[in-house]
Every structure is written in C-alpha cells, then in structure tokens.
Amino acid sequence: MAQFFKPQKRNKSVSKTLKGQVSALDHQARAVVRAAVKGQSTRFIMGALPGEVIEYKTAGKHSGHLERILEPSSDRREVPCEYYASCGGCDFQHIDEQKQLAHKRQVVEELFQKFGVFNPQTSSLPWQEPLVSEPMRYRRRVRLATRWLGKEQKLLIGFREAQSHHIVPIEDCLVADEILLHCVNTLYPLLNTSTVASKLGHIEAINTNTPVILLRITEALPGDAMQALQEWQTVNKTNIWLQSENDLQPLAGAAMPFDTSIDGDKLYFQPGDFLQVNGGINQRMVQQAMDWLKPEKTQRVYDFFAGIGNFSLPLARRAQSVLAVEGVYRMAEQTRINAESNGMDNLSSLSADLNEITASDLGKPADLWCLDPARPGAEGVVKLLHKLKPEHRPQRILYVSCAPDTLARDIAGMLTESKGCNYRIIGLSTVDMFPQTHHIETMVCLERAS
C-alpha cells in the first residue's frame, strides 16, 4: 500500500543582533564567539579578531555577520582595499602580514597535534623560516564573474561577494598584478554590448610571459565582435583565448603562454590549466623543494600530482630520471610536451587515477617522491606507500599542500609505525602563497630513518 508523507515545515531561524567577545580564530580565520547565555549557540564570524567586543547578527545555527566593532583589538589595522567589506576574495586584510603568518603556523601545529603527527609534551616540529611573499600585487591570475543587465544595457564585471552570487564591480584589485585589471578595463568597451555580454560566462586574466585573457562563452560570438577582439589583441599585445562548452581556442595570432622554471626552462600551458597564482613565491617554493629533496644524478623520482611539470622539470635537471604522474590527461600530456620542448629525455609522463595508483602502474621504485595535491589531499598515495616493501619506499618525501587538514591526515599516515613507515619530519615551513586570505600553503619533507 502506498504511504503518503507530508513534508515538515522548516522552522526559519529569526536573525538577532547580539553582543559578544571573540575568544579565538578558527582554522578558517573566523572569529569564535562563545555563547554568553544558556540556549545560545557558539558563533563563527568573519572579520573580527581575538579579544574584540563586537555586535553581530545571527545567521543560521552557528554563523553570524559582523555589524560593529565595539572594542577593537590592538592587532587590527586599517584595511587598504575599498572593496574589502563586500568582496569575497580577501578575508584577512584587517590584520598585518606577520600576524597572518603566525596564525597560519598555529593552525598547522594544531592540526598536526590533532592527527597525532607530534605531541607537544614530548617533541617539537622542525619549523624553518616561512617563505614570505610580497603582500600585495602578487596574483598573476584572476577569475572574474560577469553578468549582463539587460534593462540597464550594462555588463557587470567583478568578484562575487562571500557566500553569494552577487557581483561586486571592481576597477582594481590590490592583490592582483596591475596589468590584469588594466587589460580587462581596456577590453571592457568591446564586451559591453548585448551581442557579446549576453554570451559571456566568466573572464580569466593571466600574466606570465605575456598577458592572456580567457573569455568563457556560452555560444559563438558574431563576426564583427570577433574582428574587434582580433584588432584589440594586436594593438594591446595581449593574447585572447575563447572557451566554449567543449572547445578552447586562441584567436588567430595568439601564442601559447608559458611560465619559466627556476632553471630557465619554459613551461607551456593552456589558460584554464592549474598555475600557482603567486609566481614569485612559487619560484622560491620550487627551489626549497630542490634543497630539501637533494636529488642526485643516480636517483629516480616520482612527481605525483605533477600538473604541467612545475616540480618535474627542475627535478629532471638534477635527477637520473623523473616519472610525472597527473590525474588530468591533458596536463599530463602538457608535461610530456614541456619536457620534449626543453630537450629532456629523462622525464616521462603518466596520466593515472591517483586515488587508485598502484606500484605496477609506476614501474621501478623511486628514491624520492614529490607530492603537490589539490585540497582533497593524497590518500591514494599514502595507501601506496603502506603497500610497498620497506626496501622499495623512498628515501625522502616532499609534500606541498594547500589544505592543512588533509596534509595533517596524510603526514600522520606516512608516519604510521604500524604500517612499517619509519619516517621523520626533517623540514617544515609555511609558504606565503595567499597573503590577505586565510588560505594556507605548507611544505613538509620526510626522511626515512636509516
């Protein structure tokens, strides 16, 4: 017999304005406001600092929105960006860079302790100096949202508000390379027409060897618009690429962009490929990776999550051979092309599912491993390490992470003695890849005990 259920009505929480004192920052740089009265929830609020007394508006069960700062912290600074209150990009400009770095180091320590990587009562972590970035104008890649306002006949270009689809129109971004927004602003008159803007998804601006504008389009642009873009590209010496649902093509005359390795090798890429946003700090990070791994001409290396070869090519310059393993086929192919174009015959590329990677996929064991996974981490590679015979495990492992929670989980897995993993941490540092934001980049180097 069919049974019919009447859906329960959801109780909408009524927003209240409350006063409270911030006790700490959580791992996402949100202020923690403990419940002052029984029945109230602990709230997590972006934009406030420890010790501050604030007025906030409740949202949902545990969130809140900062309304006013009644008693500011001495650590608070004047925010330099006029869009900071509404833009969803930066979320940490209200505290200086040194304290940003101190907070990020503390987050890593707390997570390492939580996952059992170390016990502060009996040991300490071998922290080295952080790799520090320029605090502003460091981004060489930005992605901008667009919306065509039909009634006003106007194209909005900007960043989205935090936790919102609303677009904040901007003319400049203080953390972006000045040339990026200059290119977009110069191109704006050609985009601000119904025939173009109504077909526009988003815009990506990149600057490595030369500026690149990637236009995401939902349908083909008319011939006169294409001609205008072609002329603009020539005059402004900026390459334009068009991306549709199933295709990515440069305009005629647009060259393939490239990044440059620490050895001067060219790393060609397509717009849309993964590229570290902070070019200056990326160079220092790769150099530190070489210093920590110490590859030699007698050694074989696995580079997992290799991308377009950011670590693979410098490793190949120093090691006997490198196997670059990447989950995205197109980028694995790009690594192969980059090795070939730079005259390297000791670098091979493999496209494989890194969640299910096995020793038989890789061939001969490697002396050194390099890992640079996305936020979900490298559980599949950790499982591979556990399954290897002790004599087939690498001498050193370098792990670069943009997510400290999955980093802590994976490092704990690599140190698991019950799995026969006899490693110790010999290097650890934060990498200032994303100043003015709560995002954390970390490098860890493990060495197998003799």
Swiss-Prot record:
A GO biological process held by the record: rRNA base methylation
Keyword check for RNA-binding: no
InterPro entries registered for this protein in UniProt: 23S_rRNA_MeTrfase_RlmD (IPR001566), MeTrfase_TrmA_AS (IPR030390), MeTrfase_TrmA_CS (IPR030391), NA-bd_OB-fold (IPR012340), SAM-dependent_MTases_sf (IPR029063), U5_MeTrfase_fam (IPR010280)
UniProt KW keywords: 4Fe-4S, Iron, Iron-sulfur, Metal-binding, Methyltransferase, rRNA processing, S-adenosyl-L-methionine, Transferase
Record carries keyword Kinase: no
EC numbers: 2.1.1.190
Gene Ontology terms for molecular function: 4 iron, 4 sulfur cluster binding; iron ion binding; RNA binding; rRNA (uridine-C5-)-methyltransferase activity
A Pfam family recorded for this sequence: tRNA_U5-meth_tr
Amino acids binding [4Fe-4S] cluster: C81, C87, C90, C173
Record: residues binding S-adenosyl-L-methionine: Q276, F305, N310, E326, D353, D372
Active site (UniProt): C402 (nucleophile)
Gene3D superfamilies membership: 2.40.50.1070, Nucleic acid-binding proteins, Vaccinia Virus protein VP39
Role of this protein: Catalyzes the formation of 5-methyl-uridine at position 1939 (m5U1939) in 23S rRNA.
Listed name of the protein: 23S rRNA (uracil(1939)-C(5))-methyltransferase RlmD
Underlying gene: rlmD
